[in-house]
């Protein structure tokens, strides 16, 4: 009987199967595995029954280590138990994993494989986490796409129960875990039918219980431990047969051919790739393309990674193979090769296949996209008489020269007739949600296959989102970014100014739609020369739509997503437009019906507006030979910072980081970045920004106090400074009384996120939100003040620099972060830097604050304009922040105390030096009071000129008392 089809991602597929076989789920959330735990929790709360006829008991622990401990305990008492994790979370479970495996307890850890943090945090996918647990005794099963996750996850659960070996069931984080496809799903009756209930009962019967008491986890001495450890060998030797048995059962039900290893390609292939995970789907596309041209290539898909079964690999390898490339999605610095490569090498060596050329490649670290061009490059390399023994793909390694050259654009390998669409949105603008809704409409109401994948930058709400959607009449095996699209939409006009390469991803003759408020003449001014030429030379169908004003007119505020979704259906030709409108309106009624008919009608108006508001732009012939763009402004600032911005930050900011070579990071291999880069971004993504009314303002500074991004700031200017200010600078007499200064509240339209908190807090309605372009002249005023105006003394109304008003005249040393618009967290953090920033160490836990505060190359923490000092920031882990911060404080104070001992030893050399030392020692424990004495001591030591003084001066940065902060 055919299985039901449903659009879902890999996480949901894994959760669907896990729920069926689980008594207890002990969970702790970590990206990208969290949706699995959340889904299981929701189903349990809704009363869903598993194959045993029970609701799953879900318990959330205090950490991943706690979740693993709870899993271990639950298993010991006879409950079949599951958890879901990734990355550092999985690593925290390792001690318990050794115990669970050694005690032969049946459980499954579903892992959406994610990068383990190294020189930086990365929340995206590779195999560094699962490869770090391959020695624990857990069996390991890999899947390549959401359908395989659905099909093969039962093998892990069923084999664990019968084979007495726990499993790590893993698939690629984000690329598979979050990729939406229309797949066939299991009926729980089919899963129940396959389950060995006798093995379940045997497990429960052997559980710890006072009614038949036993002892587990005892202490053993060296006389017996080794022998006892070897006693588990038969279980691992028998397990592959158990896995094969359940794969055969699934194949019988589904008509598939799943095996421990699967071969795909020419029967007489001489060039073969061996890999596991989502790259296998990419490789299959390339194999189809090359074999159709008569090339002898193939692919081995690794399903059961542990236990490793050499005979099963040799069984599927073509006898004609001459060269093999093994692909690992992890890096082990200093090793002879990565794990999968070493396993294959051992297999070939033990089989006497020394004449086969074996190479090993790394790919996809941190979710690096692996398109067909990368796989083509491997097969091309294998054609050489002496291919590189070690290589990388998907990057340009101009340092150690390991990367393979790739030809782009590569041949199109996706299924014929596949419609590919790409959407550039802003985090929180509804683009991603609308596209998920679109795929659901198309998946549920047509026979088409669908694929949806969503790409993000490192910012929170307000960052770049890119939605990759594919629709077709044949299964879609394309787990890589779209770069030859039929339809591309730019949902935020700021991306045009930022130089993002969007239209270049449109196929010749394809559609490019821009959401903007521009006329055709204004569009001509905004588009750069490269975009114009590409549009003209490739017959791109260019459209604009003003969803911004339409949304306001309808009453939807900033939410343009429904209007733009409707426009997509009109232009993309993926289904009849009348049907699309009907389904969109039905979805709106279902989603918003509880909020009342007025809300439903408003969404229906938005759908109709999207159809009517699309405007076709007639492309001028002059665009084939456009005028050159003006030269970019020269960057000003410290040389190291300017280099970082030019060579690294700017490409990353325009979503072109993939183009950076390895040499771009030679100067900061350890992950260290210059502070203050965010001030150079000037993204201009807010549609509405503040306009300050000098007459109404009472100069309370509350607007600056609450601003999450430090984009509205008070300044007091002398007469000379006011005279030199840009003409657009708004000035007022100081309040509550006039003084020698002029006051301004400067606003940065290009940095503002448009949250409106300043408007909300203003007691006199002195701030209004206005269209960003109407405030363009205020940017020069803001930049002038930031660059030239310093804090003044004796400002009227300032009773203390730690008051609301007084604090805001201090330079914020956290500015223009990647946090959400209106984020209160950054408001507090910014305030702390205004009070203590020049002397701050920050230990920042992994989490929201480490993302908005620690995006590589775009640091929002900066330095004081006068002193050059500012927060020294570091992130260790999520789980150790208090300890890490304590270690920083202990380490610093230890070095400082040792230095102070040397200072004390200089007493008696001279009266001036003694006086400086005495004052320094009196204040050494007071951060604020110690600053001037520390500077005076440095001057006295420099004047002394002795060898002892010179030795102290080598570490003079330790003299002034600092403060230590831990941010969660």
Task: State what each model feature region is.
Residues 4-7, 307-312, 323, 327-338, ...:
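Active-site cofactor/cluster-binding pocket
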Residues 24-60, 253, 267-268, 272-303, ...:
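Anionic-ligand anchoring segments at beta-strand to alpha-helix junctions in alpha/beta enzyme folds, i.e.
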Residues 24-29, 56-59, 74-92, 106-111, ...:
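A short, small-residue-rich loop immediately preceding and capping a beta-strand
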Residues 52-56, 167-262:
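Conformationally flexible catalytic loops at phosphate/diphosphate-handling active centers
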Residues 123-173, 185, 197, 346, ...:
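Conserved thiamine diphosphate
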Residues 140-202, 357, 367-408, 602-624:
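Structural signature of the thiamine diphosphate
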Residues 244-396, 468-470, 481, 485-487, ...:
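Thiamine diphosphate
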Residues 580-581, 593-752, 759-968:
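Ferredoxin-type iron-sulfur electron-transfer modules and their immediate structural context
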């Amino acid at each position: 009987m055919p299985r039901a089809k449903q659009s879902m991602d890999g996480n949901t597929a894994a959760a669907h199967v896990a729920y069926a076989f689980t008594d207890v789920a002990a969970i702790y959330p970590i990206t990208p595995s969290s949706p699995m735990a959340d889904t299981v929790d929701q189903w349990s709360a809704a009363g869903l029954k598993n194959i045993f006829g029970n609701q799953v008991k879900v318990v959330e622990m205090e950490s991943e280590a706690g979740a693993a401990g709870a899993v271990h305990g639950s298993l010991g008492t006879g409950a079949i138990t599951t958890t879901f994790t990734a990355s550092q979370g999985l690593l925290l479970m390792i001690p318990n994993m050794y115990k669970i495996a050694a005690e032969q307890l049946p459980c499954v850890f579903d892992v959406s494989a994610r990068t383990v943090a190294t020189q930086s945090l990365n929340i995206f996918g590779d195999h560094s986490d699962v490869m770090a647990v391959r020695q624990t005794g857990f069996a390991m099963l890999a899947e390549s796409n959401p359908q395989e996750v659905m099909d093969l996850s039962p093998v892990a659960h069923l084999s664990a129960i019968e084979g007495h070996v726990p499993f790590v069931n893993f698939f690629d984080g984000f690329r598979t875990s979050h990729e939406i496809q229309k797949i066939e799903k299991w009926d729980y009756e089919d899963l129940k039918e396959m389950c060995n209930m006798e093995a379940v009962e045997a497990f429960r019967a052997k559980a710890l219980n006072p009614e038949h008491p036993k002892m587990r986890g005892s202490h053993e001495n060296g006389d017996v431990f080794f022998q006892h450890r070897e006693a588990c060998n038969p279980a691992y030797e028998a397990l592959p047969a158990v896995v094969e048995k359940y794969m055969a059962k699934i194949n019988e039900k589904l008509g598939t051919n799943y095996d421990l290893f699967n071969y795909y390609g020419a029967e007489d292939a001489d060039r073969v790739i061996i890999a596991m995970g989502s790259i296998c789907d990419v490789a299959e596309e390339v194999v189809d393309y090359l074999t159709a041209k008569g090339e002898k290539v193939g692919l081995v898909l690794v399903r059961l990674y542990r236990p490793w079964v050499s005979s099963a690999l040799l069984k599927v390898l073509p006898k004609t193979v001459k060269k093999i490339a093994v692909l690992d999605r992890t890096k082990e610095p200093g090793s002879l090769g990565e794990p999968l490569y070493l396993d294959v090498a051992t297999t070939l060596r033990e089989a006497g296949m020394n004449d086969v050329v074996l190479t090993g490649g790394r790919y996809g670290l941190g979710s690096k996209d692996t398109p067909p061009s990368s796989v083509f490059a491997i097969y091309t390399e294998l054609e050489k008489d002496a291919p590189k023994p070690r290589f990388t793909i998907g990057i340009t390694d101009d340092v150690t020269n390991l990367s393979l050259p790739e030809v782009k654009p590569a041949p199109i390998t996706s299924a014929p007739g596949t419609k590919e669409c790409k959407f550039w949105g802003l985090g929180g603008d509804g683009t991603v949600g609308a596209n998920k809704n679109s795929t659901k409409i198309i998946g549920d109401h047509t026979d088409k296959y669908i694929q949806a994948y969503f790409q993000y930058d490192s910012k929170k709400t307000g960052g770049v989102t890119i939605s990759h959607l594919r629709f077709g009449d044949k299964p879609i095996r394309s787990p890589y970014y779209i770069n030859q699209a039929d339809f591309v939409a730019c949902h935020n006009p700021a991306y045009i100014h930022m130089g993002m390469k969007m239209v270049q991803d449109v196929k010749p003759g394809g559609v490019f739609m821009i959401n903007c408020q521009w006329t055709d003449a204004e569009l001509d001014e905004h588009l750069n020369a490269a975009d114009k030429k590409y549009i003209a030379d490739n017959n791109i169908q260019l459209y604009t739509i003003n969803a911004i004003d339409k949304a306001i007119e309808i009453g939807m505020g900033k939410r343009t997503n429904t209007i733009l979704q409707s426009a997509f259906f009109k232009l993309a030709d993926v289904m009849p437009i009348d049907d699309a409108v009907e389904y969109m309106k039905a979805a709106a009624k279902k989603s918003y019906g509880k909020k009342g008919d007025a809300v439903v009608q408003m969404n229906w108006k938005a759908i109709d507006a999207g159809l009517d508001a699309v405007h076709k732009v007639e492309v001028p012939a002059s665009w084939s030979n456009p005028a050159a763009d003006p030269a970019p402004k020269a960057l000003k600032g410290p040389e190291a910072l300017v280099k970082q911005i030019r060579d690294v930050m700017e490409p990353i900011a325009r979503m072109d980081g993939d183009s950076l070579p390895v040499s771009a990071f030679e100067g900061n291999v350890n992950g260290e970045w210059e502070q203050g880069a965010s001030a150079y971004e000037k993204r201009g993504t807010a549609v509405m920004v503040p306009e300050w009314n000098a007459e109404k303002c009472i100069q309370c500074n509350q607007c600056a106090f609450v601003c999450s991004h430090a984009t509205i700031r008070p300044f007091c200017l002398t007469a000379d400074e006011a005279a030199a200010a840009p003409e657009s600078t708004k000035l007022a007499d100081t309040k509550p009384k006039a003084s020698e200064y002029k006051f301004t509240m400067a606003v940065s339209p290009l940095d503002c996120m448009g949250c409106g908190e300043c408007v909300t807090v203003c007691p006199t309605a002195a701030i209004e939100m206005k269209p960003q372009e109407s405030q363009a002249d205020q940017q020069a005023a803001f930049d002038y003040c930031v660059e030239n105006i310093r804090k003044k003394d004796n400002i009227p109304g300032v009773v203390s620099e730690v008051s609301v008003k007084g604090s805001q005249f201090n330079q914020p040393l956290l500015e223009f972060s990647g946090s959400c618009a209106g984020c209160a967290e950054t408001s507090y953090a910014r305030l702390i830097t205004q009070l203590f920033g020049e002397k701050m160490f920050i230990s920042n836990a992994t989490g929201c604050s480490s993302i908005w505060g620690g995006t590589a190359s775009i640091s929002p923490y900066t330095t004081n304009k006068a002193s050059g000092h500012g927060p020294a920031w570091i992130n260790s882990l999520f789980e150790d922040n208090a300890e890490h911060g304590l270690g920083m404080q202990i380490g610093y104070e230890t070095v400082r105390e040792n230095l102070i001992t040397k200072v004390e030893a200089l007493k008696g050399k001279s009266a001036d030096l003694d006086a400086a030392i005495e004052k320094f020692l009196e204040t050494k424990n007071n951060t604020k009071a110690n600053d001037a004495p520390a500077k005076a001591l440095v001057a006295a030591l420099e004047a002394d000129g002795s060898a002892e003084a010179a030795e102290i001066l080598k570490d003079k940065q330790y003299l002034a008392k600092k403060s230590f902060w831990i941010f969660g």
